[in-house]
């Protein structure tokens, strides 16, 4: 590969890294071409971009990223990079599901919002809620709190009326 082409690849990967909420490194050594096509289709369905890039070029593209040194340590053998643009957890779910049936696909490492996740943390990553799901849960909790305020106020008023009524009956 000529120098200009390498620079273009580094620039392209750097741009993808800057747009991504989550970056995942995988090893796919021993994965057949048909299985690799299946994997790419699964990633595509989940809104994830998956690229195979030379390790040295990925290392250069990740150099400005928080945790780049740790990620660079995982750049050995064949490396595929998954970019989660809208959902940083989507690649983890695809990798976990696909690797159950395909032992040739291995999760190496991930970086989400500057936090680096090791290979043994794939299960935790894949079970995390998305931002949208977390926002929905928070909105539900806030809604429940807001809805319970009038009930509490009504209970206080009802109790006050009951006390006044009892005092009135005792005075008669």
Curated annotation (Swiss-Prot):
GO biological process: translation
Keyword Ribonucleoprotein: yes
Keyword Coiled coil: no
Annotated transmembrane regions: none
UniProt keyword list: Ribonucleoprotein, Ribosomal protein, RNA-binding, rRNA-binding
Molecular functions (GO terms): large ribosomal subunit rRNA binding
Pfam families: Ribosomal_L10
Biological role stated in the UniProt entry: Forms part of the ribosomal stalk, playing a central role in the interaction of the ribosome with GTP-bound translation factors.
Subunit field text: Part of the ribosomal stalk of the 50S ribosomal subunit. The N-terminus interacts with L11 and the large rRNA to form the base of the stalk. The C-terminus forms an elongated spine to which L12 dimers bind in a sequential fashion forming a multimeric L10(L12)X complex.
Identification of the protein by name: Large ribosomal subunit protein uL10
